[in-house]
C-alpha cells in the first residue's frame, strides 16, 4: 500500500467523516470509502484472529528500535489527543519534568519512582489543603540511555503555587526537576508530542547508526540541558523515536482525565459543526494498492476553537 498526496483538495460533501473532539482542537477525517474496522481482532499479546479467514496468526513483534518507530508515532498521537482534551486552560495546569542525576536506564525503577512521588504528592496536597490534580505523564528517553519523565498536573481551577526547589525537587530526590506554567499555546498537545519526538543534534550524532533516523530535518529550538538550564540547540525532527524500546508503556494518566470523543456523519454535516473555528491544517491522501489502483481517498483537517479568539 502506498500513500500519495492528492492533486487538488476536494473532499465530496457526502464523504463519510469521523470527527474527533479534543478540547479546543477538532480533527476531521473524511474518506471516500468507509472503513468498518480492522479485519483482525487481538487475542493476546502474541496472537490475533483474521476475521476474513478465521485463522489464528502470531504477531510479528518489532525486535529493533527501528521497527518500533511507527508504533511510537501512533502512541504520541494518542498523547497529543489526551493533552489537548485536558490542558485547555493554561492557568489551571503545570508542566513538571523529572530527571535522574545518574545514568538511570531501568524502566521498572522509573515506574516505581513515579508511583512513590505521586503518593508523596497526594499526602502533601492533603496537608496543605490543595485539591488533588489529574495527571498525564509521558516518559522521554535520552541519547545516553537515561530516562526523563514529563507530567502535566491539571486542576479544575487555577493551579496552586508549587515551589520547585522546596516542594517538588526534595519530594522527587533523584535529580533535578523543573516546574513551570503552561505557556499560552492553543495546541499544547501538538507542541508537546513534537517535543518528545525531536532530539538535539549533538545527542543524535552520538547514537549508533541503527538508532538514527534515515532522513531528518534540522531546526533550532530551546531545550533544557542536564543542569536544568534552557539553551538553544539544533534539533533533529523525529530523532528520538527509535530510542523507545518495543512494548514500553510510554504514557500514564490518572482515572479522571478526559478522553477524546468521536462522532460520525457526512463531511458536509461535520463542516457545520466546526463553523467559526480556525482551520489550522488540511491535507488529502490517495491510498494506492500494490497493483497501482486507488483503494481510497482520505482527507484530514484540524480546527482550533481558541485561535480565532486570539487573532481578533
Regions found by a protein language model. Name each.
Residues 1-145, 156-312:
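Right-hand nucleic-acid polymerase module
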Residues 149-153:
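Cys/His-coordinated zinc-finger cores
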Amino acid at each position: 500500500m502506498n500513500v500519495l498526496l492528492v492533486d487538488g483538495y476536494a473532499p465530496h460533501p457526502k464523504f463519510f467523516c469521523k470527527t474527533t473532539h479534543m478540547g479546543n482542537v477538532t480533527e476531521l477525517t473524511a474518506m471516500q470509502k468507509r472503513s468498518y474496522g480492522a479485519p483482525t481482532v487481538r487475542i493476546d499479546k502474541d496472537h490475533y484472529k483474521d476475521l476474513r479467514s478465521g485463522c489464528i496468526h502470531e504477531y510479528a513483534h518489532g525486535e529493533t528500535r527501528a521497527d518500533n518507530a511507527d508504533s511510537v508515532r501512533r502512541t504520541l498521537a494518542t498523547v497529543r489527543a489526551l493533552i489537548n482534551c485536558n490542558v485547555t486552560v493554561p492557568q489551571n495546569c503545570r508542566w513538571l519534568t523529572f530527571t535522574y542525576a545518574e545514568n538511570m536506564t531501568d524502566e521498572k525503577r522509573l515506574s516505581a519512582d513515579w508511583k512513590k512521588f505521586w503518593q508523596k504528592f497526594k499526602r502533601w496536597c492533603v496537608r496543605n489543603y490543595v485539591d488533588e490534580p489529574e495527571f498525564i505523564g509521558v516518559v522521554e528517553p535520552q541519547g545516553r540511555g537515561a530516562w526523563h519523565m514529563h507530567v502535566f498536573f491539571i486542576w479544575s481551577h487555577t493551579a496552586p503555587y508549587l515551589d520547585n526547589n522546596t516542594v517538588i525537587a526534595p519530594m522527587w530526590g533523584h535529580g533535578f526537576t523543573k516546574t513551570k506554567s503552561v505557556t499560552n499555546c492553543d495546541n499544547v498537545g501538538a507542541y508537546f508530542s513534537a517535543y518528545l519526538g525531536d532530539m538535539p543534534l549533538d545527542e543524535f550524532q552520538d547514537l549508533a547508526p541503527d538508532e538514527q533516523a534515515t532522513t531528518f530535518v534540522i531546526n533550532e529550538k530551546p531545550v533544557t540541558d542536564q543542569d536544568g538550564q534552557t539553551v538553544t540547540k539544533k534539533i533533529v525532527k523525529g530523532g528520538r523515536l527509535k530510542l523507545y524500546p518495543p512494548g514500553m508503556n510510554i504514557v500514564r494518566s490518572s482515572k479522571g482525565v478526559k478522553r477524546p470523543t468521536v462522532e460520525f456523519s457526512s463531511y458536509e454535516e461535520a463542516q457545520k459543526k466546526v463553523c467559526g473555528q480556525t482551520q489550522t491544517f488540511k491535507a488529502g491522501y490517495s491510498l494506492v494498492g500494490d497493483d497501482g489502483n486507488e483503494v481510497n481517498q482520505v482527507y484530514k483537517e484540524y480546527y482550533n476553537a481558541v485561535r480565532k479568539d486570539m487573532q481578533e
